[in-house]
Design a protein with these regions (language model features):
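Hydrophobic/aromatic residues positioned on beta-strands within the core alpha/beta folds
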Residues: 82-83
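Two-component/phosphorelay signaling modules centered on CheY-like receiver
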Residues: 14-32, 98
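Receiver (REC) domain active-site loop signature in two-component systems and cognate sites
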Residues: 58
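Active-site beta3 strand of CheY-like receiver
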Residues: 47-53
Length: 133
């Protein structure tokens, strides 16, 4: 049996991490959670992540900065941004231009998040397939 997709959640809000983790596990995904971008970058299995759910604003490195770092390091991890500041059109545009799969406002709609994760996983499989060819 194949391993379930691995979803990594990076958010400084513990309640968000716990609720997203619970939702993802309830539909059969493996989940890892991190309180900061730095914690995620120091994780030994970063490359195993199939989808990254990432808060935009966090103390230390922001979600946008983490996205830039991953791009510069040639990590092709599909990213879903989540934020309590959805009205920041400039940040939203930058995130999507840089390849984010979705940009969702908190409080999160479970349906919207699950749809975004499915889209991210489809995109990720396409990226992996093209590398193999």
């Amino acid at each position: 049996m194949a391993n379930p997709p691995l979803i990594s959640v990076v958010d400084d809000d513990n309640s968000v991490r716990e609720s997203v983790q619970s939702l993802m596990r309830s539909v059969g995904f493996a989940v890892t959670v991190f309180a900061s971008a730095e914690e995620f970058l120091n994780w030994d299995h970063l490359r195993d992540t199939d989808c990254l759910i990432l808060d935009v604003r966090m103390p230390g490195m922001s979600g946008i900065e983490l996205q830039r770092h991953l791009m510069a390091s040639h990590y092709e991890i599909p990213i879903i941004f989540i934020t309590a500041h959805a009205s920041e059109e400039e940040v939203r545009s930058l995130a999507l231009r840089n390849g984010a799969v979705a940009y969702l406002a908190k409080p999160l709609s479970e349906e919207a998040l699950l749809n975004a994760v499915q889209s991210a996983l489809s995109r990720g499989r396409g990226n992996r397939q093209s590398k193999l060819e």
